[in-house]
């Protein structure tokens, strides 16, 4: 649909895919006019008859589906390089000769200064974004989702729902669920349940006001003065549990614990939270963000309490190096030093008349592990940590029976069976089942290589790669075959070697019935099915008999 009108190669690269939205028909004309084999979300929805749109971006050449535009764009560059018929003008490649002939007609009628032209009306634009916006006027009738009440059509169902709420609200008889408190009606039962939480909060607020008694004019209600001099009053009390708060928004957020309301939802995995700070902290798992760095060793943490707990390890090690007295491991001593940074809101605890204020006491002591000295703020975190020392693994997988010491590890492992990959890379669209895998993958996009070998100076993006490389200098081979006693420096080499004893051949050729124990043998074998020069560089025309050689060659063109 987007054709760059020029005689010579396009400046951005002839094989560069151009992104475009809009449905089309399965004809040779429209198939080749779409940008570089990229199919839109609307096209997939219209042709699949309402199938799920999770992987609706489809390549027009190989029919593979992808979760996002970026992943499809990266795939299309490699997929198009395999097509056998290149355009002599711009280098774009096609699978069939009629498509190439149709494409060449565009160059025959083009002029160098017309830019991006609409193939329907001939109007030219300086940029492809302006052309995309213009094409929506032509493709209005192709939008797959139609409003049943008017003539408007939409690409996505959420656009239709927003339009229906704004322009076509349901009639009173179509809203059978009526609130008994205020008389407001709703079309769905879950909408009524969500609305009733407002009245529950109002009832709790009235009960709290009655429990606190009448307020003096001109000042908020306060409790009896507590010993401690500068203790701050907490006038807002929860009617259900009696917990007090200094500010009313904290009380409103606390009420959600009793009502069960969780209005803040994670857009990545759908998990819901009562407070927005909890959601912000949770989303760092998906993004891999660790905003709290340690000033001593550079290690980064997602949460500030974890950084404070980690910094105590450096303080203990400094005291040990200076010969200072160390507290016993079983009973840690409270230090009178103030916290590194004053918290904006101290811990909310029930305070009654005559009871000492928690703010006047020393900061809460950490629960310290007797084996390694690591401190934890909560006892349940300490118990989970101590399972690592004892070897206890109480959480078992229901699918394969594998045991884990932490429930979070079991949840992450269960994604192996379910196939769920909630962590997506923003650069290439690749998805991962664990946040740590995404964080390690992000280093592939970063140009820096922070892990340097002290022996030869070679740099690596990942620390395990450096550890495996250093075994070349040390000669260490820790992985021993139990069958023949042969040792290897890397575990992957041992796994590959053991297939000689087991006879396993997991790599099967898709073109014939042969299978191989090594992936390299399969790659070498597949060359016999591929004719010479099957992989052609779309920029300079050089041909290769292996896709890996083509990709390595394209790096010279900065593709």
UniProtKB/Swiss-Prot annotation:
SUPFAM superfamilies for this protein: beta-beta-alpha zinc fingers
Residue(s) carrying N6-acetyllysine: 33, 276
Subcellular location: Nucleus; Cytoplasm, Cytosol
Single Gene Ontology MF annotation: zinc ion binding
Pfam families: zf-C2H2
SMART domains given in the database record: ZnF_C2H2
InterPro entries the UniProt entry points to: Znf_C2H2_sf, Znf_C2H2_type
Pro residues composition-biased segments: 337-347
Keywords associated with the record: Acetylation, Cytoplasm, DNA-binding, Metal-binding, Nucleus, Phosphoprotein, Repeat, Zinc, Zinc-finger
Cellular component per GO, a single term: nucleoplasm
ZnF endpoints (C2H2-type): 57-81, 85-107, 116-138, 145-168, 177-199, 236-258, 264-286, 292-314, 367-389, 395-417, 423-445, 451-473, 479-501, 507-529, 535-557
In-chain residues carrying the UniProt-annotated modification Phosphoserine: 27
Disordered: region residues: 1-47, 313-364
Broad class of the protein's primary localization: nucleus
Function: Sequence-specific double-stranded DNA-binding protein. Binds ATT-rich and T-rich DNA sequences and facilitates DNA bending. May regulate the expression of genes involved in cellular fatty acid import, including SCARB1/CD36, and genes involved in lipid droplet formation. May regulate the expression of LCN2, and thereby influence iron metabolism and apoptosis-related pathways. May regulate the expression of genes involved in glucose transport.
Quaternary structure annotation from Swiss-Prot or TrEMBL: Homodimers and homomultimers. Found in a complex with RIP60 and RIP100.
Name of the protein described by the UniProt record: DNA-binding protein REPIN1
The species this protein was found in: Bos taurus (Bovine)
């Amino acid at each position: 649909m987007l054709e760059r009108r020029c005689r010579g190669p396009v400046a951005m690269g002839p094989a560069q895919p151009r992104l475009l939205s809009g449905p089309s028909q399965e004809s040779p004309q429209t198939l080749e006019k779409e940008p570089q084999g990229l199919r839109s979300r609307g096209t997939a929805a219209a042709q699949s008859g309402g199938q799920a749109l999770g992987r609706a971006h489809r390549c027009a050449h190989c029919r593979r589906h992808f979760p996002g535009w970026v992943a499809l764009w990266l795939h299309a560059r490699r997929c198009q390089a395999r097509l056998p018929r290149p355009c002599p003008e711009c280098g774009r490649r096609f699978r069939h000769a009629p498509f190439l002939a149709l494409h060449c007609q565009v160059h025959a009628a083009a002029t160098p200064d017309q830019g991006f032209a609409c193939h329907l009306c001939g109007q030219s634009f300086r940029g492809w974004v302006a052309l995309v916006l213009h094409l929506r006027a032509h493709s209005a009738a192709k939008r797959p989702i139609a409003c049943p009440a008017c003539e408007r059509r939409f690409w996505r169902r959420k656009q239709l729902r927003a339009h229906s709420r704004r322009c076509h609200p349901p009639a009173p008889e179509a809203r059978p669920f009526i609130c008994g408190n205020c008389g407001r009606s709703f079309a769905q039962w879950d909408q009524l349940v969500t609305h009733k939480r407002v009245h529950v909060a109002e009832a709790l607020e009235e009960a709290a006001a009655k429990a606190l008694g009448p307020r003096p004019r001109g000042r908020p209600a306060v409790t009896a003065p507590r010993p401690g001099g500068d203790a701050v009053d907490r006038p807002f009390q929860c009617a259900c549990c009696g917990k007090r708060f200094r500010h009313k928004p904290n009380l409103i957020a606390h009420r959600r614990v009793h009502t069960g309301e969780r209005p803040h939802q994670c857009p990545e995995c759908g998990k819901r939270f009562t407070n927005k700070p909890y959601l912000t902290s949770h989303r760092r798992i998906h993004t891999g963000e660790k905003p709290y760095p340690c000033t001593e060793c550079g290690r980064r943490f997602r949460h500030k309490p974890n950084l404070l707990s980690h910094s105590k390890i450096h303080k203990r090690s400094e005291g040990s190096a200076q010969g200072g007295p160390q507290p016993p491991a079983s009973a840690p001593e409270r230090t009178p030093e103030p916290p590194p940074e004053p918290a904006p809101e101290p811990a909310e605890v029930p305070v009654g008349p005559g009871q000492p204020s928690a703010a006047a006491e020393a900061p809460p002591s950490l629960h310290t592990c007797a084996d390694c000295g690591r401190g934890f703020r909560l006892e349940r975190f300490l118990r989970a940590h101590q399972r690592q020392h004892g070897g206890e693994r109480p959480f078992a997988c229901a699918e394969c029976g594998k045991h884990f010491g932490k429930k979070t590890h079991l949840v992450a492992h269960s994604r192996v069976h379910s196939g769920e990959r909630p962590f997506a890379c923003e650069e290439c669209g690749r998805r991962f089942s664990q946040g740590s895998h995404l964080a390690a993958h992000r280093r592939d996009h970063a140009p820096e290589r922070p892990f340097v070998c002290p022996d030869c100076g070679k740099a690596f993006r990942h620390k395990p790669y450096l550890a495996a490389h250093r075994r070349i200098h040390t000669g260490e081979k820790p992985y021993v075959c139990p069958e023949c006693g042969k040792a290897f420096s890397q575990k992957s080499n041992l796994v590959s070697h053991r297939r000689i004893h087991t006879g396993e051949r997991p790599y099967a050729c898709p073109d014939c019935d042969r299978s191989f124990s090594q992936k390299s043998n399969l790659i070498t074998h597949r060359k016999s099915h591929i004719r010479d020069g099957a992989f052609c560089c779309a920029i300079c025309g050089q041909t290769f008999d292996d896709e890996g050689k083509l990709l390595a060659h394209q790096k010279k063109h900065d593709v």
